[in-house]
Regions:
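Domain-terminus/edge residues, biased toward the C-terminal soluble/receptor-binding domains
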Residues: 166-170, 178-393
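A generic local structural motif
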Residues: 7, 36-38, 247
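Short, compositionally biased leader-like segments
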Residues: 11-28, 313-329
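Active-site-adjacent loops and short helices of periplasmic peptidoglycan-processing enzymes
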Residues: 13-187, 191-200
């Protein structure tokens, strides 16, 4: 009965949704005890390659063999999902856009929702199937919608990977099914995962444990067990093939700190989940953001060639700095002005920066902006002054 709940979901009397799962997914629990490893300690993770990254700064907090090229299985789908999110942002498509399944999309093996050629679903429904159940047919249907063909979509995937600096990645398909030369790294997966979670919409799908399609006839259960069992989980994607073994890109957020943990080539399904959990525990236990304020309240800065000798300025922004909880808080701020600040000046012009340093390293800067307009001192302005002086006599 338990096996049926996780691995076999009713579509009709004849078909069941095929999903990434196995007996050990069901019978072996995820470790519940939190990892309390400190910085410098080694994490016991049973996988060939893994990484922990803070997605905004792209700072690597822990890694092992993170640049080794490996097969990613369905973690590949992070890139198609990113391209779909970007297409929605551009208003090229909407969640209500209807997609008609092609014969090619319906021919996919592996995880699938058994789309029939000519069957129609909305982008919203196909996203559910792709994110929650890792459905290959749904993913290809989305790719064909955006690029006209899977081949064209894969070209877009590789182009976007290059733009993101994923230098060790080559996609051969959009599903992650094993193919010669279809390779990436844990580091590159962390980069594209970081980009995907900038889109809050993805979390509408990646945080869901169970959902359904076809008016409730087709049940979906998330292949990412952390969604149910790990506090703060926000997604993201599992992957399993005979070559790639067990893979996971997992995202979680606690107390304003969001992290991306990637595990590639685990020997068992729970190796990937326990590995990601250990990485996330390590990050949350050892790192946090510190907010540094500019604290440059309204003041004046001398300028050249203006009707006034000084302009009012201020800097009221903040810089959020990712620091280890044991790291030195040796934070210093230095005010640096642009050279030869001359009129005319417009309100909002950037005239300098408050530079934030930790030790010798610059870790952020905050703009110093003009609070007013200042005209250039020219002939017409001078002539106007003279006239004002005459009429004031």
């Amino acid at each position: 009965m338990i096996l049926a709940v996780f691995c076999s979901f009713t579509v009709s009397a004849e078909k069941t949704i095929s999903s990434e799962c196995s007996i050990d997914d069901i019978n072996v629990p995820i470790e519940t005890e939190e990892t309390n490893a400190s910085i410098g300690q080694t994490l016991d993770i049973k996988a060939k390659s893994f990484i922990l990254m803070e997605p905004n700064t792209k700072k690597i907090l822990y890694e092992a063999n993170a640049d080794e090229k490996l097969s990613p299985a369905s973690i590949t789908k992070v890139m198609p999902l990113l391209l779909v999110m970007e297409a929605i942002d551009r208003k090229d498509i909407t969640l209500e856009t209807v997609v008609t399944a092609s014969e090619h999309a319906c021919s996919m093996g592996g995880s699938q929702i058994w789309l029939e050629p000519g069957e129609s679903m909305t982008v919203d429904e196909l996203l559910k199937a792709t994110v929650i159940a890792s459905a290959n047919d749904a993913c290809v249907a989305l790719g064909e919608l955006i690029a006209g063909s899977e081949e064209g979509f894969v070209a877009l995937m590789n182009e976007r990977a290059k733009e993101l600096g994923m230098d060790n990645t080559t996609f051969k398909n959009c599903t992650g099914l094993d193919a010669e030369g279809h390779l990436t790294t844990a580091h590159d997966v962390a980069i594209m995962s970081s980009e995907l979670i900038k889109h809050e919409l993805i979390k509408k799908y990646s945080t869901v444990w169970m959902d359904s399609l076809r008016d409730g006839q087709s049940e979906l259960v998330n292949t990412n067990k952390l969604v149910r069992f790990y506090k703060g989980t926000t997604g993201l994607k599992t992957g399993t093939t005979s070559i790639a073994k067990y893979c996971l890109s997992a995202t979680a957020e606690r107390d304003g700190l969001e992290l991306v943990a990637v595990v590639l080539a685990g020997e068992t399904s729970n190796d990937r989940f326990n590995g990601a959990k250990k990485l996330l525990d390590y990050g949350f236990a050892n790192y946090s953001f510190t907010s540094v304020k500019a604290d440059l309240k309204e003041t004046e800065k001398e300028i050249l060639d203006g009707v006034k000798k000084k302009v009012k300025v201020s800097a009221d922004g903040t810089v959020d700095i990712l620091l280890s909880k044991k790291e030195s808080k040796d934070i210093k701020k230095t005010t640096v002005w642009n050279e030869n600040i001359k009129a005319p000046i417009k309100k909002g012009d950037v005239l300098g920066y408050v530079i934030v340093n930790q030790g010798e390293n610059e870790i952020g800067k905050i703009e110093i902006k003009a609070l007013e307009d200042v005209e250039k001192l020219g002939f017409l302005v001078t002539f106007r002054w003279i006239l004002n002086g005459i009429f004031n006599l």
